[in-house]
Amino acid sequence: MKMKRLALLLTVCLAFFGCKQKPVDGAQLLKILNDENLSLVVSNHDSISRHASPRVDDLMRILTTEPERLKGAVVADKKVGNAAASLLALGGVSEVHTNYATHSGKRILEQAGVKLVYAREGDFIFNNDSTGQCPMDSTLNGIADHNEGFARLQEKFYNK
């Protein structure tokens, strides 16, 4: 708790005196994500935001309420499949670091010109029961347009 307060105090002091924080690279963001058991870390506009919601909930919220937060951002995401990759591409991030990327997620980010750094790559992300593909990713199978993908996810999972 003391470390969080100290970090906050340092950030406030730096902002007050017009100093900028030293840019954080993607490897550092991934370390933060893993060390703090988060699902998403976003670095942009001289600030870092930490998120711990399941699935792509935080990406959907950011795209809906503050899309400028992702434009040009460096992001660490726990797993990147179709859904996360499409949302990250739609948001205009510049770089993504992840522990695991699917082949299709990797392809989506490459086509969008997003730099991707990953530890492992595989066919798909499993659903919660480990019996098949993640339902969010399967919702976007065959959808190339990121706006359409966002709308489908919104309709199927978030408009209830």
Task: Tell me the role of every PLM-derived stretch.
Residues P23-N99, E121-G122, F126-T139:
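Conserved mixed alpha/beta catalytic, RNA-binding, or beta-rich assembly cores of soluble enzyme
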Residues L6-L14:
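Sec-dependent N-terminal signal peptides
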Residues K106-K160:
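C-terminal binding/interaction regions
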Residues T102:
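Conserved SAM/SAH-binding beta-strand->alpha-helix loop
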Residues F17-G18:
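C-terminal motif of bacterial Sec signal peptides marking the signal peptidase cleavage site
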Residues M1-K2:
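N-terminal secretory signal peptides that target proteins for export/translocation
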